């Protein structure tokens, strides 16, 4: 089964302009992420889906595989263009965020393995236990509600499931949190990904601004894999400086 990882990337980030090619460590951010993703043993290829020539040149400079795409509303649409044009023999496509240079390659492998093991699932994603009340309350932290058999039931920016009888603090103190933090890594079956990106935005997707709800609202099964922790994303200048500090500490 051929599996391809694709990193959607663009220079026009509003909170952190030119994010993929920031290079205070001596390597661009997109190179860090590409190199880590390439360590996933499940992937036969890793491709960067770039939005402009400057970014494509940066990827070519370190020997990465890059495909230039047109303008798109989402990273998923950007990936679909690359898949349709360049990956005719791929069976599974993994959407890897281009701004997560500390992602664990084993997490990529776990998402792929779960999809390979469940032929009735159309896609898989990751979650991690959510135990911090501040993160739980934040609309920027997406919560996942999961069934016992590993299927996703819903994703929301609200606190779901809702605890009617006990406070959030009391539930968390019990040491058995029912809440899960959704991690935005996805493994798709190729044909399902192409079909999904042709569907119009769904009502709940538009309400929550969560693209994965389009799949649920159209009857797809999303499998969920729980991992112990999530890699910090880089969305702001502060996030990037913290990454640089961690990298320098780890690399002397």
Tell me what each language-model feature is.
Residues 2-49:
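N-terminal glycine-rich phosphate-binding loop and ensuing alpha1 helix
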Residues 88, 169-252:
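Conserved alpha/beta core of the MobA/IspD/sugar-nucleotide pyrophosphorylase nucleotidyltransferase superfamily
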Residues 47, 53-113:
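Short phosphate-binding loop-to-helix
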Residues 43, 88-90, 119-121, 220:
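Short, high-confidence coil segments that cap the C-terminus of an alpha-helix
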Residues 50-51, 103, 188, 235:
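A conserved hydrophobic position in a structured secondary element of the catalytic/binding core
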């Amino acid at each position: 089964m051929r599996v391809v990882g694709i990193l959607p990337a663009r220079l026009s980030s509003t909170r952190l302009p030119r994010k993929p090619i920031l290079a205070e460590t001596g390597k661009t951010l997109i190179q860090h992420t590409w190199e880590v993703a390439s360590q996933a043993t499940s992937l036969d290829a890793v491709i960067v889906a770039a939005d402009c020539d400057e970014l494509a040149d940066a990827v070519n400079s370190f020997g990465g595989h890059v495909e230039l795409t047109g303008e798109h509303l989402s990273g998923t649409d950007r990936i679909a263009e690359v898949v349709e044009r360049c990956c005719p023999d791929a069976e599974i496509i993994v959407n890897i965020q281009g701004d997560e240079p500390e992602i664990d390659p084993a997490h990529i492998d776990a998402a792929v393995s779960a999809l390979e093991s469940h032929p009735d699932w159309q896609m898989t994603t990751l979650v991690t236990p959510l135990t911090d009340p501040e993160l739980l309350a934040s609309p920027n932290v997406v919560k996942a509600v999961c069934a016992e058999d590993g299927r996703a039931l819903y994703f929301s920016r609200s606190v779901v499931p809702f605890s009617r009888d006990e406070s959030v603090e009391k539930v968390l103190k019990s040491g058995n949190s029912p809440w899960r933090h959704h991690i935005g890594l996805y493994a798709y079956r190729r044909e399902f990904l192409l079909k999904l990106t042709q569907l119009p935005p769904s009502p709940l997707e538009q309400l929550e601004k969560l693209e994965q709800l389009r799949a649920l609202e159209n009857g797809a099964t999303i499998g969920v894999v729980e991992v112990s922790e999530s890699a910090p994303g880089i969305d702001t200048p502060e996030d990037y400086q913290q990454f640089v500090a961690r990298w320098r500490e780890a690399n002397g």
